[in-house]
Amino acid sequence: MARENSTFNSDFILLGIFNHSPTHTFLFFLVLAIFSVAFMGNSVMVLLIYLDTQLHTPMYLLLSQLSLMDLMLICTTVPKMAFNYLSGSKSISMAGCATQIFFYTSLLGSECFLLAVMAYDRYTAICHPLRYTNLMSPKICGLMTAFSWILGSTDGIIDVVATFSFSYCGSREIAHFFCDFPSLLILSCSDTSIFEKILFICCIVMIVFPVAIIIASYARVILAVIHMGSGEGRRKAFTTCSSHLLVVGMYYGAALFMYIRPTSDRSPTQDKMVSVFYTILTPMLNPLIYSLRNKEVTRAFMKILGKGKSGE
């Protein structure tokens, strides 16, 4: 029984990204610092938008959902990586691996669709200001947000079910710092070619389709801004949209590089570096990009901070 299916009878081994050399120890604590900033930044963003009623608009409600997704994303991977590094243990249970794959894939997919919804929100606000309250009513905004979560979760379920239906009869060492389904496919001794084609189609739906919506929305936005008579209105529109476009560029650039490539072209080192970028760095940068360039968020933060000081 050389090819006996050992999928469910032992743990996987996460090789991680750091060893215990002085340089890697420094990098490990740097990642923890970035994680702390990302955790605090996204938590503050969610709380600000929840507490300040003036921020209860479609744009900020969508932004709070993006921050919530980023918060969950970093908590899916970094704590386990830190525990393994500090404890010296590299194992992860089958249930733990499945949980990481589900949440990681679901959150990435949900963010893809949510970024498209955010682009549509900016399009309606700038190109159809008189109809904005109808086109982006609380009900419609809530439905599109829920749709983003559902589509992302569906992809996560598909990946978990498909990945753990394969046989893993050889090495169980995952060349990554968390369970990612492309890394598991490399270890499988089953024929994964059909699933890789399905995975490619899912990536097209999750990445290319939302990108097409974003490009179409911002093409119309740019044309509308160019024809604006007010210089102040043009500046405000570009400031609002540039923050979102910067986040979109960082997120989709890394995602396209990571998941559109064939398995045969993958390098474990490249995958680790890219994963660190959009699972830790991007969630840290998102709240900074939106808050530093947004007077309403800054005002809400100072308002809450002022209440805290006055209550002391």
From Swiss-Prot:
Subcellular localization: Cell membrane
GO biological process entries: detection of chemical stimulus involved in sensory perception of smell
Extracellular side: 1-25, 80-100, 159-195, 260-272
Gene3D superfamilies per UniProt: Rhodopsin 7-helix transmembrane proteins
Any one annotated GO CC term: plasma membrane
Glycosylation sites noted in the Swiss-Prot or TrEMBL record: N5
Membrane-crossing segments per the record: 26-49, 58-79, 101-120, 140-158, 196-219, 237-259, 273-292
GO molecular function terms noted in the UniProt entry: G protein-coupled receptor activity; olfactory receptor activity
Pfam families: 7tm_4
Keywords: Cell membrane, Disulfide bond, G-protein coupled receptor, Glycoprotein, Membrane, Olfaction, Receptor, Sensory transduction, Transducer, Transmembrane, Transmembrane helix
Spans within the Cytoplasmic topological domain: 50-57, 121-139, 220-236, 293-312
Cystine bridges: C97-C189
Mode of membrane association: Multi-pass membrane protein
CDD domains: 7tmA_OR2T-like
Job description of the protein: Odorant receptor.
Family: Belongs to the G-protein coupled receptor 1 family.
Designated name of the protein: Olfactory receptor 2M3
Lineage, opening ranks: Eukaryota, Metazoa, Chordata, Craniata, Vertebrata
